[in-house]
Amino acid sequence: MKLHELHARSLESTLILADESLLRMRRLLREAGQEGIVRQVTNTMNEDARHDLIVAIDELARDFQSLAADFSLEQHDLDLRRVLDAELSSLWVDLQDCRPDRMKGYGQTFTPEAGALLENRIERLLARIEAIRTTLLKS
């Protein structure tokens, strides 16, 4: 069944988010956790439970695939460069929001030392992101 373009786009957006969530859950279950920069996902599950959840998630993924097929939503190819550029753009925006001047809205001000250090570190991270973007655009 074909949906109106606006409805199809909305459903497709939800399915993209669902797909990313399912991929992330599978990865966490297969790798039994994840160590990150400021948080760690610790495995507290036995192997059988993780296996059962992977099976259930795979079934859910098939249901999402069926939903997409029922409404004639097709898979689209995305250029890796565009995906990476979008990720870098998101990081850039998130870092801009971490600048001391932007965080004033929380009602607390930074000490001069902390504000200067944070601003300096944000600038360095943004420069690295721009360098990666330049490399990406040249590839």
What are these regions (language model features)?
Residues 1-139:
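Long, low-complexity or tandemly repetitive, helically biased scaffold regions used
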